[in-house]
Regions:
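C-terminal "cap" of GNAT-fold acetyltransferases
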Residues: 46-82, 192-222
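Conserved GNAT acetyl-CoA-binding A-motif
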Residues: 8-22, 153-163
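Non-catalytic C-terminal interaction regions
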Residues: 176-242
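Conserved catalytic-core motifs of GNAT/GCN5-like acyltransferases
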Residues: 17-19, 37-58, 182-194
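Short, cationic low-complexity segments
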Residues: 81-112, 212-242
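Conserved acetyl-CoA-binding loop-helix of GNAT-fold acetyltransferases
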Residues: 1-10, 15-18, 26, 33, ...
Length: 242
């Protein structure tokens, strides 16, 4: 990872990403020494059958991963669109990274009819990923169909990556919250078109979120926000379906 960081600096790559386990803080501390900043948390991404030799863990069931970003080169200014209730946490992330972002919360509807996205799912890991390139009027209807297929495949964790530079991103995130998607991460320069707002839906309510270890107070604050958002959105979705 350190070698990758040095290579990224030499070639002017904006930054590098790392996903660290949360059953202990060792890998997180190593990343902190390289200048990495916590940008998100993916709940229950690691199968509960995965264990680390010689490392005890109090986590029960599937394990979560902490997402970190390390700025290694020039990061240009961008205008992004996110829901208002994500505003404080995203502002904190970009301030800690010392990058320039103009943040809008206005829920602009899409200006195009047809969405563009790619989707993948694994029956082994029980994780599904959807990466949206273009937000169109048909996005939610098409995602509902895709997510139904994921559920039939036994997927527990579904992630949707939205292009934050799309003015309709805040609208799409609000619509996806109705489908039980909550904030997972804010990922600067993650796609060729810029920043990504990652949302997640974990359908197994037995997920252990009480033993997620973070290496410093900033990570703990981000973890607490993400866990509380997951609880709030999931509870809201369950109540609305009754």
């Amino acid at each position: 990872a350190e070698f990758r960081n040095e290579v990224a600096k030499k070639i002017g790559t904006p930054g590098t990403y790392a996903n660290c386990v949360t059953n202990h803080v060792g890998s997180q501390v190593t990343a902190f020494r390289r200048g990495a900043v916590e940008v998100g948390l993916v709940l229950g991404e690691v199968n509960d059958g995965v264990s680390m030799t010689g490392l005890a863990t109090t986590t029960k069931g599937r394990k979560s991963l902490l997402s970190l970003y390390n700025v290694t080169g020039p990061v240009g200014h961008r205008a992004v669109s996110i829901p208002e209730h994500h505003g404080d946490v995203v502002r904190t992330i970009v301030e800690r990274l010392d990058i320039s972002r103009e943040i809008s919360h206005h829920p602009h509807r899409p200006t195009v009819a047809v969405s563009s996205f790619s989707s993948s799912a694994s029956a082994v890991s029980k994780v599904g990923e959807i990466r949206v390139e273009t937000i169109g009027e048909d996005l939610i209807a098409r995602l509902v169909e895709d997510l139904e297929t994921q559920v039939l495949a036994g997927v527990l964790l579904s992630m949707v990556d939205l292009p934050a530079s799309d003015p309709a991103c805040a609208w799409a995130a609000a619509e996806l919250e109705r489908l039980a998607f909550s904030f997972s991460a804010y990922l600067p320069e993650f796609s060729p078109d810029g920043d990504v707002l990652r949302l997640q839906r974990f359908t197994d309510l037995s997920l252990d979120v009480d033993h997620i270890a973070c290496g410093r107070a900033e990570g703990e604050a981000l973890r607490d926000f993400i866990v509380e958002e997951w609880r709030r959105v999931t509870r809201k979705a369950v109540l609305s379906s009754e």
